[in-house]
Amino acid sequence: MLSSQSPSIYTVSRLNQSVRLLLEQEMGQVWISGEISNFTQPSSGHWYFTLKDDNAQVRCAMFRNSNRRVTFRPQHGQQVLVRANITLYEPRGDYQIIVESMQPAGEGLLQQKYEQLKAKLSAEGLFDQQFKKPLPSPAHCVGVITSKTGAALHDILHVLKRRDPSLPVIIYPTAVQGDDAPGQIVRAIELANARHECDVLIVGRGGGSLEDLWSFNDERVARAIFASQIPVVSAVGHETDVTIADFVSDMRAPTPSAAAEVVSRNQQELLRQMQNGQQRLEMAMDYFLANRTRRFTQLHHRLQQQHPQLRLERQQTVLERLRQRMNFALDNQLKRVVSHQQRMTQRLNQQNPQPKIYRTQTRIQQLEYRLAENLRARLSTTRERFGNAVTHLEAVSPLSTLARGYSVTTATDGKVLKQTKQVKAGDLMTTRLADGWVESEVKGITPAKKTRKKKPV
């Protein structure tokens, strides 16, 4: 039996779980550089590969929701920099890392340093807005810290010459690329502050790769810009290039040319502003003089209006106007009375019954005439229709047929005889003629011979 002093006994599951927790809690998230091998991507979309160097290797997994953010396709033998969590796959006891992000090793290392320095300086408050110094407006002298042979200096001088040719420019030439560049940039910033020759500084260079721009991601340069008593405008690379110097400077310009635009005044614009100001001043003076002239004219007119003769004339004018209004009112009143009288007379005439009686009699006569005409027309139409009916009836009447020499013979039972086979010898029959009836007895029957119909040829 085991004694009470025996060490704790782990099951395999508990051991793997404890090791996993220890790895995840103690190691946390780390950056790892290595070479990719055995890269696979099953249908799940996850990536599985081995990360190795000359002496060791480790299994890696990068799940689909993480690898979809990778901007390149990992290749066998490629050097990469990954950010990952250390863990243990408990069922098999395999030690592995779970990759969260992946970058190519060259720029990836620089990017990591960039992010670390950015976080450090931000935590110290070097990027805070409260420390940003305002740019002079207008600037009386501009200092430029850049390479004396680079395109950035040419662009800056070209813009300054175009916008403000009289603005003094002091160039502090430095290297902007290489191991010595950060130190030279720092010394140039310190020199400009020591001389007090200019009231704004442009620090920058033209575009390039991350390595080319790395001098402006140097901590020494960032702290020198922050410590500068002269406001600093950063102008590094193109608009898409963002460096530590951009965050710590008092203002970031997307390009060197834009920085020159920021620190200079457009003399042509100033000339237009002066011309506009002069025009506004002339307009204000014209308005002032016109206003004073109008006021003088008003006072002069009022003075003339106070003359006694003018007042008397105005009173006479008012009196004449009142007289005209009174005559007009009397005429209108008289017209209204006459008009009212005419309307009353017209209404009275309209109430007289004689015109109504006359109109009613006339209406009755018209109706009587129309009634008589309608009766005559209807009687004529009825007579015509009756005559047509009689003519039609006579045309189809059997009596008319009898009058033409035909007759109708009937048996004793009243049936009309049409064929000889309906009677026999000794039968009585009655014949209807046009003017009466004849009764006779059948003595003999002789059928008529049938005529043959000719066949068509």
UniProtKB/Swiss-Prot annotation:
Keyword Manganese set for record: no
Enzymatic reactions: Exonucleolytic cleavage in either 5'- to 3'- or 3'- to 5'-direction to yield nucleoside 5'-phosphates
Enzyme class: hydrolase
GO terms for biological process, alphabetical: DNA catabolic process
Compartments reported by the entry: Cytoplasm
Alphabetically ordered keywords of this record: Cytoplasm, Exonuclease, Hydrolase, Nuclease
InterPro entries, A to Z: Exonuc_VII_L, Exonuc_VII_lsu_C, OB-fold_nuc-bd_dom
A molecular-function term among this protein's GO annotations: nucleic acid binding
Cellular component annotations (GO), alphabetically ordered: cytoplasm; exodeoxyribonuclease VII complex
EC number assigned by the record: 3.1.11.6
Role according to the record: Bidirectionally degrades single-stranded DNA into large acid-insoluble oligonucleotides, which are then degraded further into small acid-soluble oligonucleotides.
Oligomeric form and interacting partners: Heterooligomer composed of large and small subunits.
Family named by the database record: Belongs to the XseA family.
Protein name, UniProt field: Exodeoxyribonuclease 7 large subunit
Organism: Enterobacter sp. (strain 638)
Name of the gene encoding the protein in the UniProt record: xseA
